[in-house]
């Protein structure tokens, strides 16, 4: 099932018992964020949350944790809620191969029902804003998609980027935005500022789950998130034209903000509790001026809690990081079997591969660090053999404990790039990277004194299936 907007997704969650409606009166702070934080502390299957009785807000409707469990993630892909995580990733990979799927242009988007322009804009009136963590420097929009175009190639649909970036609400029509240098919007801004220009952008709030997943997925520079969204949802993705910028935006969004990143202008932004589980601190960041707002009547506001894992962002970013890394590595190294980059947006990746020759696994690890995502995120790689499942942590721990000799199996790479939000980097944005080779050596590599590894007995698979069926029949 493909969801054209947030509302149809929420209805599907409700139908599956995965939307918890909280009718009692709550405070915007700290209740909304604390409840979302709590969903990551109550075990598997946490629901999405719905609030419509918020003290101090008139008729505000807020939803959080919409993709904050593997059940909800499965529903977002149109899969049964009990679909195992590995099968969800396998399905993600299968659908990826359908790229590109041309989007469907639609008229009369619901977000065109109401508009506000120029100095009449007051974001504090339109959006029910609240802080997510006690140390945040202000109100943040953190689950929105930002649309930008390459200023030197404006008509190239593939170079129109859709990405998720945090934005601090700093005034009635002013935002602070952090363009991470490794992301496409940073390149768009660089090109605009070289020409002495502002960079037009459109900001979409309250989106369907698939474009949200795509906004968190590291695609190549000329790959369209809308075309990949169509592949992932297995039907053309619906888009409409934003009235001020003329950009392509999701047809089903709740709110559209249009304006510009003001060229060569920076102001202090932050601090903000980030996906790393740490506050990022305050830094000089870009300034956004909002010139037009379009919104549905009674819009639904969606926000994302970030903090110590696991929270919703880990479910959102995990598969969306594993799959592109796998696809990019598999295209160059067919021996690669699987990639687990579920942890902190891929700052750690576990990769299983066959080996053609000695040192091969390390070469794969190096390539992972130089993919578009790896340049800014993949800080540590654990390489394992093809018979080790990267998603089975006991197997990974076995490989680490039995196959690694620290004297020669740790490859340290000094002064490499990483996103500035990595709290371990020093200075911010520079770090040493590490490859841990937990594979069995092949010629001419002569590490260790390995004998033949113990394999499962040939009959084990059949017995596993038989025992599983017997247990199921006993219930």
Describe the role of every protein-language-model region:
Residues 1-272, 277-287, 291-475:
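Extended, highly charged
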